[in-house]
Structure formats: structure tokens, C-alpha cells
């Protein structure tokens, strides 16, 4: 029965509404360099696509105008180096890449992220995610033994209560889902929630959040483990279903 419910929830549709997003920036001391905006074409398989590209002018300036449908995780790339940010429809962004952010010279596998300062007029999504990530990563770093190696869940429950109290934002649906599925992963990994409870609370009869990176990361992590343990079918078999459902919405 659970197997059929899993397939059914994957076919829930989403509504799209395209809006113009403006990106400007400057890469100090880097004229005539390729700048790109990259997003995931498919978060479930990790396929990327470039949605805008341009060369910096003699002063290092660049500008893009994009029509996007959904808030989503993105990369700003300068040549082969790239750094992370979050795109929101109808928003504007200003990037400052300092002159000491030298392009990496080594192997593409050893490259550091592109460092930049971003000024986002996006309703607060970028700063909200940055602030939440700092608190969440600090919590994991300082409590890793208690979270994963003991049965004492009090520290996790207290942290979840704190996050729910301080990071609820009904005006930012992407951020609310980002937080919700980050905490879902924490509950599952700390064994506060078992497989069946996670399925019922976070996936069955819930919309598929194709563009939310935390949802998709947890989806992949959970179902790979779930299918391996339950021997239902392989996670890889779900990707065509997910992509078909996305294509008809």
C-alpha cells in the first residue's frame, strides 16, 4: 500500500508564474571574463543548466535580466569558479566579486567556491537562509555526539522548538519548506522519527517541491535508505516518474 501512495504523491502538480529577475554585479580587475547564472534543471539527478551568460565589460561589470518561475538554489559562475545563492522571481541582486578573489588555477576537483558579496532585494530569502544555516551548522557541530550516538533527544527537541519559534515566515514559502525539510532530516537521522512516520508526515499526500534544494536533498537521502532497507525498488527508478510528473505540470 505504501508503495502505491509513494507513486501517487509524486504526481501532484505545481503552478508556475514567470517574473523578471535582475542581476547586476562587478568583478574587480577581471575584464572580458565569462559570467554565468546556473541552476539545477533537475535537483533529483543533479543535472545543471546555464540560464544566462555574458562577458564582463572593461570595468568588470555584468548584468542579466531573467524570467524565472520559482524560487530556487543557483550558482553565480565566473569562468570555472562558482558560488551559491538563491534566486527569487521578481527580485534584484547586486554581486561584488573582489579583486583578491583570484580564479583558481588547480584541478577543477580542488577548486574553492567563488567568493562574493551579494545584496539581495528578494523579500529576505537570501539573508534568512544564510542566518538559519549558520545556526543549524553550529548546532550540528557542537552536538554531533549527542545527536547521533546517544538516545537522548532532548537537545534536538529543544533546538527544533527554538527554530520553529524563531524562523517561521509565512511570507516566504520557500524558506518555510527549506527549514521544515532540514528539520525533517534531523528528526530522521537522530531517530526521533522512524521511516513510517517520516513518510506520513513529510511525503505522502504532500506536494513535490521540485525546486526546493532541502526537500530534494532529504528526499534522495531518505528514499535511497528506505528502498534499500525495505527492498521495494531502487531510488533510481523514481527519477523518470519524478521528471514525467514535473513535465506535465
What are these regions (language model features)?
Residues 1-25:
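Bacterial Sec-dependent N-terminal signal peptides
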Residues 19-171, 188-205:
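A non-transmembrane, solvent-exposed segment enriched in polar/low-complexity residues
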Residues 169-174, 209, 213:
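Short solvent-exposed coil/turn linkers within tandem alpha-helical repeat scaffolds
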Residues 181-249:
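Charged, long alpha-helical assembly modules
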Amino acid at each position: 500500500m505504501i508503495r502505491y501512495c509513494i507513486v501517487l504523491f509524486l504526481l501532484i502538480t505545481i503552478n508556475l508564474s514567470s517574473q523578471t529577475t535582475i542581476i547586476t554585479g562587478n568583478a574587480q580587475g577581471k575584464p572580458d571574463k565569462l559570467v554565468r547564472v546556473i541552476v539545477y534543471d533537475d535537483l533529483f539527478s543533479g543535472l545543471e543548466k546555464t540560464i544566462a551568460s555574458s562577458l564582463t565589460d572593461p570595468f568588470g561589470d555584468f548584468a542579466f535580466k531573467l524570467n524565472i518561475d520559482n524560487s530556487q538554489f543557483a550558482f553565480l559562475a565566473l569562468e570555472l569558479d562558482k558560488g551559491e545563492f538563491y534566486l527569487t522571481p521578481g527580485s534584484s541582486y547586486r554581486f561584488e566579486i573582489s579583486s583578491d578573489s583570484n580564479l583558481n588555477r588547480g584541478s577543477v576537483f580542488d577548486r574553492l567556491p567563488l567568493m562574493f558579496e551579494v545584496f539581495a532585494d528578494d523579500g529576505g530569502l537570501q539573508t534568512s537562509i544564510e542566518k538559519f544555516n549558520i545556526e543549524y551548522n553550529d548546532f550540528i557541530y557542537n552536538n554531533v555526539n549527542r545527536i547521533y550516538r546517544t538516545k537522548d533527544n532532548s537537545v534536538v527537541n529543544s533546538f527544533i522548538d527554538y527554530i520553529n519559534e524563531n524562523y517561521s515566515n509565512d511570507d516566504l514559502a520557500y524558506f518555510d519548506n527549506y527549514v521544515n525539510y532540514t528539520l525533517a532530516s534531523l528528526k530522521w537521522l537522530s531517530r526521533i522519527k522512524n521511516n513510517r512516520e517520516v513518510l506520513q508526515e513529510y511525503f505522502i499526500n504532500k506536494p513535490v517541491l521540485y525546486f526546493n534544494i532541502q526537500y530534494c536533498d532529504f528526499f534522495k537521502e531518505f528514499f535511497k535508505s528506505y528502498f534499500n532497507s525495505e527492498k521495494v525498488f531502487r531510488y533510481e527508478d523514481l527519477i523518470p516518474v519524478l521528471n514525467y510528473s514535473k513535465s506535465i505540470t
